Amino acid sequence: MEGSSKKIKITIVTDDGKTNMLSEEKNGQNIIVTHDSSMTLMSTLLKNELVHGSFCGGRGDCGRCRVQFIRGVMIPTMLERSVMTAEELRQGYRLACLTRPKDDCVIRLSFAEEKKIAIISEMKEMSEFDDQLSQQNEQSVNQTTCVSDTCVIEKKASATDKDVETVIAVDLGTTTIAMQLLEIGTGRILDTYCAMNPQRRYGSDVISRIRASVEGKRKELQQMVLFVLKEGVMKFRRRCRSIQGMCIAGNTTMVHLLMGYDVLSLGRHPFTPVEIGLQVYEDSDWEFKVWIAPGINAFVGGDIVAGLYALGLLSDSSSIEHNDRCGELDKGLADIAGKSARLLIDLGTNGEMAITDGRRMIVTATAAGPAFEGGAGAGIVGSDMIAKVAELLQTGVLDETGLLKEPWFSEGISVGEPAVRLYNKDIRALQMAKAAVRAGVEILWKRMGQPPIDQVYLAGGFGYYLDVEAAFRIGLLPVSMRGKVTAAGNTSLAGAYRIGCDLLDGTTDKGQLEKRLSFIESINLAEQEEFNALYVRYIDLR
């Protein structure tokens, strides 16, 4: 009841140097905050800007916002009992997003440490598709390691760069936002600006943000992203006077939040987007045109479309069958048309996949949950999680069904540096995600007619850091793909650049681009009869 709330004092102990908070006062002295007893502890921590945000949006199912009560511990909730061990509960550990302190208390924050986020800001060499991009990126994929809110790659501006005609490419991700200033025609990178997506304050996944938007945070979520974009543009303007345009590629939810749309329809069946085509964003602060890359549906968005565009896979290949050409078949696809297939996989909270044989393209997506971003409470990035599980499997500590042997079955096992504990539930989350992705890959391949796979592209940071052999060892990818896997880097960012340039010079337009997308077949895995059987088949680690 509203009248039953009261103001209490919470003392946060910071004398051990282990507290994972943002305050500059965290070393050497305790912090005292005022708390409304009707609110969750997490709301007070966020209000006082002591933590970045809630990993799961306050649902309590990730188990990562742990605090230890030194005095004034609350009775654990049922959900807290399910995500923490009996010993942890006895030691006073609770979840900040669930607990509501009623009296003065003393706590120590024990949040899962934020991993350094590697923002992949270039695409690997793809000379068979684009000679210009390959010349620019032939050495390596550029990356920025970020654990704070913003990361900037500083480059000295030369006098000759001031009047170069440029385009801004943006990869609007759920976790990070990467921006690049590139020279039109050559693809030369003049500057880069990266930031954590500030919307993570309301959760690390799109469902949490949809809920926050529906509950009244729509304008705030929009302004959070606009602030980052305007900071990046302001930096780029100091570098170059002639910015011709900006193209933003992001998943469907991120784009809807940027545009200020009502996202309620994205959170419930039949998951219908407000707008999925190529859009123009109007802002009086920007004198240049801003395009939003088109998506395919609620689950396969503009980031994947941009990736397909960058790799040369989004050709007008379907017009071979429809006798309705919009342009020439891309060089890379002309060589394989009807003979073999290429597969693009982008793994994160959602696993988006696309397959093409040069004539047809089929796309799908599967919910991977937090497994590829780290086990629910483990605090391990997804690529490391796969490597660790493969190692445990090889050493016999873990069996193929995903069970840890004793004594680790009961106590979990310490892995990595710094050490974190893996429990059976963390491994199970990875198994479920792995089974869903593997089943999705097989369904796409069968729907395409089971052609030989010529190339597999892994997009984004996950693919860049993935130990491919470990992925084969746990059965994430079929062994028939061994030797055919390429970490393609940030294909979303590269595609945003290419789309922006092509729109500027008239190589493509809204009608042509959307016509290409109209030929793409999209399948819902949940509606495929064989999905459940394949899911069960691939749940084991083999």
Predicted regions located by residue number:
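Acidic, glycine/GT-rich loop-and beta-edge segments that sit at the periphery of enzyme/chaperone cores
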Residues: 6-9, 93, 112-124, 132-133, ...
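Glycine-rich phosphate-binding loop plus the immediately following alpha-helix
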Residues: 192-226, 289-290, 295-311, 358-400, ...
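Conserved phosphate-binding catalytic cores of ATP/NTP-utilizing and phosphoryl-transfer enzymes
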Residues: 125, 146-165, 288-342
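Fe-S ferredoxin-like electron-transfer domains
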Residues: 2-11, 75-168
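Immediate flanking context of iron-sulfur cluster ligation sites
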Residues: 35-63, 70-96
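Catalytic phosphate/nucleotide-handling subdomain of diverse soluble enzymes
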Residues: 357, 455-457, 461-516
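Phosphate/ATP-binding catalytic cores across multiple sugar-kinase/actin-like superfamilies
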Residues: 228-236, 304-311, 430-452
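Glycine-rich phosphate-binding loop of actin/hexokinase-like ATP-binding domains
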Residues: 179, 187-205, 264-280, 316-318, ...
